[in-house]
Amino acid sequence: MPKKITALIKLALPAGKATPAPPVGPALGQHGVNIAAFCKEYNARTTEKMGLIIPVEISVYEDRSYTFILKTPPASVLLANAAKVKKGSATPNRVNVGSVTKAQLEEIANIKLPDLNTTEISSAIRIVEGTARNMGITVSD
């Protein structure tokens, strides 16, 4: 008989830098998960993606064991890196903070494709393009 899931925890953590300090410690501690073991395993699986925020979905079972699934980095983080900006515009419809090329958009869409609700790359590009527009990043050819 499969183990029963008691909690599903979603966190967005810096790759290779998870520590037992908040937000990890309190989120996992209240469900009885071994925090140090999770941090060590997460850091080992994300070392090659240093500098990015990697969302993680942790399933906690009734015997206090856990499994976790790593998601793709948020499109906003990938776009900010591609445009070489720290953060998006406070007023995206008036102030543009950077620009990305169509090729960079396609590359980001390919990275994000497994986590998007589409299977077609053209739709994924449009989704990422909308995120760029909302951040005040222009798309150039």
UniProtKB/Swiss-Prot annotation:
Pfam families: Ribosomal_L11, Ribosomal_L11_N. GO terms for biological process: translation. InterPro entries: Ribosomal_uL11, Ribosomal_uL11_bac-typ, Ribosomal_uL11_C, Ribosomal_uL11_C_sf, Ribosomal_uL11_CS, Ribosomal_uL11_N, Ribosomal_uL11_N_sf. The keyword Ribosomal protein applies. One of its GO terms (cellular component) is chloroplast. PROSITE patterns: RIBOSOMAL_L11 (PS00359). The keyword tRNA-binding does not apply. Keywords: Chloroplast, Plastid, Ribonucleoprotein, Ribosomal protein, RNA-binding, rRNA-binding. SUPFAM superfamilies: Ribosomal L11/L12e N-terminal domain, Ribosomal protein L11, C-terminal domain. GO terms for molecular function: large ribosomal subunit rRNA binding; structural constituent of ribosome. It is found in: Plastid, Chloroplast. Signal peptide: none annotated. Belongs to the universal ribosomal protein uL11 family. Part of the ribosomal stalk of the 50S ribosomal subunit. Interacts with L10 and the large rRNA to form the base of the stalk. L10 forms an elongated spine to which L12 dimers bind in a sequential fashion forming a multimeric L10(L12)X complex. Forms part of the ribosomal stalk which helps the ribosome interact with GTP-bound translation factors. NCBIfam families: L11_bact. This is Large ribosomal subunit protein uL11c. It comes from Thalassiosira pseudonana (Marine diatom). The gene is rpl11.
